[in-house]
């Protein structure tokens, strides 16, 4: 059955580089047109589209969730739905979850590990977590052949990097265009200097073999000294604020950084933060850049024709009051969008969640090499 056409009128569309007043046409779960109509149009013989009044609201693209705790491992359905609804409440409309297969698992057993996401309310994709000792040609060929394009490599000691068979796996990774993510667990027991040295060695190897990768950003890492295409940095806390200040001072400069919205830390009392500019920067780092790194752009992370209609409705008064000097609100209070829409359907509205269990799609046709961040 064809989905009803929807027009969102009167809203302010937030992009990575600015805010524009425009109406948004949605059909079949996708954005079809963005423009500002001065006169209403009526076509004979066609049904009038359903109009949504977004006056006094910002329209933001949905954010990309990258939780540390795999949601697919939750085995009780009520607990799982509560976790997904919390993500929606925070403004996330897409999830990058982690699959942690054991070496003995075959295809049906791996599929069982992903079964809980059949109840997902939002679209999701997978990154496969593997220890460095298991990252060989056979393993890479298996997971790439099954459609996975994000591999997270767990490294505990620096010497594990040089035991990896880079000559064998690099042609496979570049052929399938697979993004690698480095994870150094806290229980590895590395101090700050050892962790930083390991990160630098990893980045150097990935640049040498022309493999795109993302790592956790460290305060000691200087982004300018690394490759702007092959190296992507995931930032948290104060490191994220440092990057946002840099972008605010160099508005059109490219910087390969991503962040999860709930991990952004910004001191709103600093005078250099313009409310709407900061909102654009949050969209750039936590939505557009995150979608590019995960290979989901331009389907996710933007409000443009052809993209999925994943839209957050945020009242301007709720955002702008954070910058009044008398308030003590933190950035975390932003995690309260008025309404959330996914693929043109309401997920959250009037403080109520829609009964859309199972609406989320598994997105494996991702392309993490397509865009510079």
Task: Give the predicted meaning of each segment.
Residues 1-22, 26-27, 35-37, 84-90, ...:
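Active-site microenvironment of metallo-dependent hydrolases
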Residues 65-78, 125-136, 155-156:
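Active-site mouth loops of central-metabolism enzymes
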Residues 2-10, 48-53, 215:
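Short hydrophobic beta-strand segments
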